[in-house]
């Protein structure tokens, strides 16, 4: 006579739950082993993930940004719960990004190989400037003629109208940077990094580099058309490291992308902001461009204890003649910093 066996039991007398406990424990050990290996591999990439639980997005200090004393945690790290891999990205301009598998294979590290988007005025829905934006620039001593020549436009983002600084290269729109009236910035994603006003320096051997688009426009009001602006602002401090190779110099990719224009210049006047970051930017530019052909602008005094910050501030307060004088009085860049 055959014996009835309960559904929850196997014929050897062990329940299915009992049978699978050792297998589950073994699986946990495998995952733990993978996580330990992954932590070590991440450490080799300069990422300390010891306090980052799997399955949760953790914020860390980016190993590439050099945030100094600010301690900004700009790197987001995600470790997959099964320990198979981890991915990370930095929201600051260094652009560090990567995926690491537990076997140690680095799928990607820097944001290279991205396909550049092709954009047009129509595709990104730019519009002619309204009176409010024109009045904004008029208050900063920037004329409508200068705005028109530089093809400054506007865009509607949600319920807000923002300024659109269009970036052109040989007549082609390659990027666009937006500025709200409350001074918030955003750029079109996955577009080519170039200097603002690039086509204005194609046929000249002497160029001026400023820190922001309004400063480039201000230079034009003072009679200087051979001026470009950096697209990304300034670093907090000068890097203590050697200049990276072209493929790794992501923060200054616009310099490499514009090298065909810049290499023809015999005299480069650096007119960045007079504050700490502005002077750090001046040094980083001079390091890459060659200090022997660079000149540095010192902004005139605003008061006994304070200097003007930038070109647009000089234009607004003192007019085009003093701005022109400041540029003409630029001094040779110190070969030793």
Swiss-Prot record:
InterPro entries reported for this sequence: TOPRIM_DnaG/twinkle (IPR034154), TOPRIM_dom (IPR006171), Twinkle-like (IPR027032)
A GO molecular function assigned to this protein is: 5'-3' DNA helicase activity
Residue ranges occupied by any Toprim domain in the UniProt entry: 205-304
Residues binding Mg(2+) 1? 211, 273
Which sequence ranges are marked TM in the entry? none
RNA-binding is among the record's keywords: no
EC number(s) recorded for this UniProt protein: 2.7.7.-
Q: For Mg(2+) 2, which residues are the binding ones? A: 273, 275
Instruction: Identify the cofactor(s).
Output: Mg(2+)
Entry keyword set: Magnesium, Metal-binding, Nucleotidyltransferase, Transferase
Cofactor-binding details, from the entry: Binds two Mg(2+) per subunit.
CDD domains xrefs: TOPRIM_primases
SMART domains per the record?
TOPRIM (SM00493)
First-level EC class: transferase
What the protein does comes down to: May act as a DNA primase.
The record's annotation in PANTHER family points to: T7-LIKE MITOCHONDRIAL DNA HELICASE (PTHR12873), TWINKLE MTDNA HELICASE (PTHR12873:SF0)
Protein name as annotated: Primase homolog protein
């Amino acid at each position: 006579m055959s014996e009835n066996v309960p559904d929850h039991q196997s014929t050897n007398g062990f329940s299915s739950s009992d049978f699978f406990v050792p297998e589950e424990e073994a699986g946990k050990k495998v995952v733990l082993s993978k996580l330990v290996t992954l932590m070590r591999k991440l450490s080799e990439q300069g990422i300390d993930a010891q306090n980052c639980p799997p399955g949760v997005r953790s914020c860390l200090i980016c190993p590439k940004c050099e945030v100094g004393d600010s301690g900004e945690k700009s790197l987001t790290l995600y470790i997959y719960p099964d320990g198979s891999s981890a991915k990370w990205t930095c929201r600051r301009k260094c652009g560090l990004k990567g995926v690491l598998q537990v076997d140690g294979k680095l799928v990607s590290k820097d944001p290279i190989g991205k396909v550049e988007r092709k954009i047009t005025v129509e595709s990104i829905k730019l519009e002619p400037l309204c009176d409010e934006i024109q009045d904004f620039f008029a208050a900063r001593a920037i004329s409508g003629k200068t705005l028109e020549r530089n093809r400054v436009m506007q865009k509607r983002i949600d319920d807000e109208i923002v300024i659109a600084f269009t970036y052109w290269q040989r007549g082609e729109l390659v990027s666009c940077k937006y500025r709200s009236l409350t001074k918030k910035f955003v750029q079109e994603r996955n577009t080519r990094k170039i200097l603002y006003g690039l086509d204005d320096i194609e046929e000249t051997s002497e160029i001026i580099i400023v820190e922001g688009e309004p400063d480039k426009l201000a230079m034009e009001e003072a009679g200087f058309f051979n001026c470009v602006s950096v697209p990304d602002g300034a670093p907090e401090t000068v890097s203590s490291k050697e200049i990276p190779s072209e493929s790794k110099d992501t923060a200054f990719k616009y310099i490499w992308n514009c090298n065909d224009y810049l290499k023809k210049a015999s005299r480069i006047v650096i007119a960045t902001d007079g504050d700490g970051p502005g002077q750090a930017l001046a040094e980083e530019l001079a390091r890459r461009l060659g200090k022997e052909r660079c000149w540095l602008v010192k902004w005139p005094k605003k008061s006994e204890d304070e200097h003007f910050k930038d070109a647009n501030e000089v234009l607004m307060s003192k007019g085009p003649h003093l701005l022109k004088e400041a540029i003409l009085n630029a001094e040779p860049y110190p070969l030793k910093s």
